[in-house]
Amino acid sequence: MCCVCGEQSPDLKNGLQKQSRSARRSASKKWRYQMNSFHYFVIFASGSLFSGLMFGLLNYAPKYVLLPTRSAPHHLPDGKFLQISDEARVMEPYFPAVRMAGRLGDGNNGSGKIRTEPHDTNEQEALSSLKVAIEMKTMGKDDKAARLFQHALALSPKHPEILTKYGEFLEHNQQDVVRADHYYYQALTVNPSHSEALANRQRTAQIVEHLDQKRFERLDQKRDALSSVSDTNMALKRAEKEAYIQHIYHSVGIEGNTMSLAQTRSILETRMAVDGKSIDEHNEILGLDAAMKYINATLVNKNDFITLKDILEIHRRVLGHVDPIEGGEFRRSQVYVGGHVPPGPGDLSILMNHFESWLNSKQAFLFHPVKYAAMAHYKLVHIHPFSDGNGRTSRLLMNTLLMRAGYPPVIIQKQHRHKYYDYLQVANEGDIRPFVRFIADCTERTLDLYLWATSELSHPVPLLAQETMPDGVPLINSFEKESTIEGSGAGEAIRIGTI
């Protein structure tokens, strides 16, 4: 600064300006640093808050809101399905018959009856037919009434009123209390509060149970009579051999095998191929033969429970010649059997373990042997654990259980395959009793054949396509007459001693 005039020197002025600019730059840097720190803090805090919110939502909010889940259809049965204490009710929620109930109306109207207002042409026609059927019944025209009831039922098979009225007609006009009870049961499956069906079922249930018990007692008497025949009886040995061949013939025939009885016998006795028949049809016969020999050699006299391993060994032999890779193995894909959708492959292991537990439970052992074997057959074929051979394996398991109880292996005729499948479907709809009765009828038919063949006259073993013995005596009266007989050589009697 100049001492005389007081002005700053140029050098000093320039120095002060530089210091001022430096101070401003420092202040600016400090401000930017502070702002950057604040921004970083805000970003960090926001990220932390967002992470905390997401963590809370994922752990406490309903997961079906945030994450789409993949689940199997609810038509699959669970373990409870295999724990049946009352064989008449097979866990209805797993069967299509119960799910169809909602199609009959909108729900219960508070009066104890499901609304059944006609909502399509079929139901309108069914109810009209029902009305006329009741009029014909009142007038004593039972033949016309029966046809009209059946027509109404065909149009609307799950209508509780039609089921109940048809059951009443069967019970009172045709004295068929067993079938009547079945229709009352079906009506209650659709509408558990149907008052008429409830009253009717309370009346018929004990009667039907008594009739079923008498049937089982009759089977035991015939089994005991057959057991009294000496094992060295030559007629018995020949009958067993012939029944063995017929069992294989009918069992593969149920599945569609076109071999005749004579051709089946030729394959089993000579192991030679039959002209004009596929390799698979030959191998189906050989596989069933191998499985039956395994059962006779190991399982019939086994002093232990039947295990899952035993069932797999049976199946391994059933498919041993047809598909050895799949034999004894659970299927690895979903299958569809008519209207029935079996469990998915991922559920088979646990379901089969549950089945094994039921098979060897005290509860199952309390059933009559025929009922026990029939229920085991149904349960296994319903699970459908294999890609092929489920029916043959189920029938073989059934016969294993029967033979362990002193019964001969039961033959289900190929001529009755439609009844066989129909009764399985009825069981799918919730009532297994008709299927058990069907197996009981087949058991009695087989026992009658053995007793006839081992009588003092040493009769021939009739073909199971016949409904009567060679002298006209009926085998049993449980089946309707068949108008046609399948298979070559039908109507002839197989003479004991010719094989």
From Swiss-Prot:
Reaction(s) catalysed by this chain's protein: L-tyrosyl-[protein] + ATP = O-(5'-adenylyl)-L-tyrosyl-[protein] + diphosphate; L-threonyl-[protein] + ATP = 3-O-(5'-adenylyl)-L-threonyl-[protein] + diphosphate; 3-O-(5'-adenylyl)-L-threonyl-[protein] + H2O = L-threonyl-[protein] + AMP + H(+)
UniProt TPR repeat ranges: 126-159, 160-194
Keyword Repeat: yes
Annotated compartments: Membrane
Keywords, ordered alphabetically: ATP-binding, Hydrolase, Membrane, Nucleotide-binding, Nucleotidyltransferase, Repeat, TPR repeat, Transferase, Transmembrane, Transmembrane helix
The keyword Ribosomal protein appears for this protein: no
Protein's UniProt name: Protein adenylyltransferase Fic
Organism expressing this protein natively: Aedes aegypti (Yellowfever mosquito)
